[in-house]
Amino acid sequence: MSIANLARRVVRALTPYQSARRIGGKGHVWLNANEAPQAYPFTIEGNRLNRYPECQPAEVVNGYAAYAGVNPDQVLVSRGADEAIELLIRTFCEAGEDQILICPPTYGMYAISAETCGVGIVEQPLTACRQPDWPAIADRLSDVKLVFLCSPNNPTGDLVGRDGLIALLEKARNRAIIVVDEAYIEFCPKASVVDLLARFPNLVVTRTLSKAFALAGIRCGFTLASTEVIAMLAKVIAPYPIPDPIAQIAAQALSPMGLELMQERVAELNKQKALIKTALTALPCVREVFEDKGNFILVRFVDSAAVFAAMKAAGIILRDFSTKPGLENSIRITIGYQNKMDAVLAVLRDQPVSL
């Protein structure tokens, strides 16, 4: 008997999530993982490392609650938003019985987490306008425990319509939990739906420090929800999920100075995003530029394979989405500082008109 035969059936059949780092590649301009273009220095004190950390570091919880405009008992800190996704599925879904609903094309970890937990997946594709199909989702509420929506959506960059979300939350009361993934919300903060937590106990919002806060390397995420939901998740989360050095860095990032740095970074990246979007729309090798509410732009090219190969040859690593339904010939470009965006445009301007 092989070791593989000892593994759970769902794990043997599982195709792991193809993260940017797993896919890899060789280059010097990395624009494939929606990371911030620059790290910032933080200080760490090591005199507490002999002790286990707090399960939920108070300084981080209180800091994020103040930043997000919620009460501290509505916040759970986790190892990235990915752990928050998995915690929600493990907490609310029975393996082999329950299902989640996703709206592809969207972030892949919703499905991977469900598969790993032995939970079924209902796919309700986005509409032609790249919005959730609200009536179709409402019709499936009796079949699912959790509905995952990404706003801004990765990879298309679209925001979830607020009116449609409110109507769905009303219909889902006491039936299903609606999860809104706001990993990129700092790039369009007025579009946040956190304010709806006060009205809907079945709403959950997930957040992260990986994008606008430039802290992808520390894996720190947040769940914002009703106190009842948070209490349930707290039963399931590991006893010491946040290492003390991570908590120290997160607390500094959430300080007044840290928030100011984040907002300055977001303003600069949004500026670069507007500039490259304008430039992209004028290029003959570009067929469509998608919505741009995150720190990335999805672009449909005349021939994405040729563009991807040319970028790779130039040492520029992007993320290919051309195999995803409805995203034929599409590549996602992470927004960086001007020199990186100029490098991308230089390659595209050299592409033949008749690709």
Swiss-Prot record:
CDD domains xrefs: AAT_like
Reactions accelerated catalytically: L-histidinol phosphate + 2-oxoglutarate = 3-(imidazol-4-yl)-2-oxopropyl phosphate + L-glutamate
Keywords noted in UniProt: Amino-acid biosynthesis, Aminotransferase, Histidine biosynthesis, Pyridoxal phosphate, Transferase
Top-level EC class as recorded in UniProt: transferase
One GO process term, biological-process aspect: L-histidine biosynthetic process
Cofactor: pyridoxal 5'-phosphate
E.C. numbers: 2.6.1.9
Modified residues (N6-(pyridoxal phosphate)lysine): 211
GO molecular function, one term: histidinol-phosphate transaminase activity
Pathway, per record: Amino-acid biosynthesis; L-histidine biosynthesis; L-histidine from 5-phospho-alpha-D-ribose 1-diphosphate: step 7/9
Keyword Amino-acid biosynthesis appears in the UniProt entry: yes
Keyword Heme: no
Entries under PROSITE patterns matching the protein: AA_TRANSFER_CLASS_2 (PS00599)
Subunit and interaction comment: Homodimer.
HAMAP family (UniProt xref): HisC_aminotrans_2 (MF_01023)
Family note: Belongs to the class-II pyridoxal-phosphate-dependent aminotransferase family. Histidinol-phosphate aminotransferase subfamily.
Name this protein carries in UniProt: Histidinol-phosphate aminotransferase
Species assigned in the record: Aeromonas salmonicida (strain A449)
